[in-house]
């Protein structure tokens, strides 16, 4: 799982308290968080995780599909805000489902804002849309790792997108 430990625990609490039928996560990466959330849904006894990523590497897909929790996971490869991808996501959401969304893919402001607009309408009352890595906005350039993407500096990161969306 490539997330801050406190964020993982907070997400776990939200999932446990809201018991969503569907969790959509954009940004699969290695699949750790998708499988973590699937295991929580297994404990709850219901639900499925829809993982969306522009590039699901073959070895990561195999690892996820061979995992014991794969029965609670559907993977969609494609741009998270592309019409075709969004159509596939919608097809996997049964009618009257409680839907939670976690946005954790491309962290540039424009992309996160596009995801907020595209996926926000799928979140059902009583559930949440989580925008990951908003803490990036609080890292000063001089304190950031030298190999950090320039697109993540203040003003072009998830928190700026979230603030514009709200």
For each feature predicted by the language model, list its residue ranges.
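S-adenosylmethionine/decaboxylated-SAM
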Residues: 2-166
């Amino acid at each position: 799982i490539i997330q801050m430990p406190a964020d993982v625990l907070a997400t776990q609490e939200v999932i446990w308290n809201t018991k969503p039928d569907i969790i959509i996560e954009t940004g699969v990466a290695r699949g750790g968080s998708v499988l973590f959330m699937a295991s929580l849904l297994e404990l709850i006894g219901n639900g499925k995780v829809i993982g969306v990523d522009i590039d699901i590497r073959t070895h990561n897909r195999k690892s996820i599909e061979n995992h014991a929790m794969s029965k609670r996971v559907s993977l969609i490869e494609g741009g998270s805000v592309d019409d075709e991808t969004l159509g596939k996501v919608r097809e996997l959401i049964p009618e009257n489902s409680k839907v939670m969304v976690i946005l954790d893919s491309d962290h540039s402001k424009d992309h996160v804002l596009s995801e907020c607009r595209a996926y926000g309408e799928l979140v059902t009352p009583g559930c949440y849309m989580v925008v990951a890595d908003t803490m990036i906005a609080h890292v000063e350039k001089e304190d950031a790792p030298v190999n950090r993407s320039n697109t993540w500096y203040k003003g072009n990161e998830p928190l700026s997108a979230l603030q514009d969306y709200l």
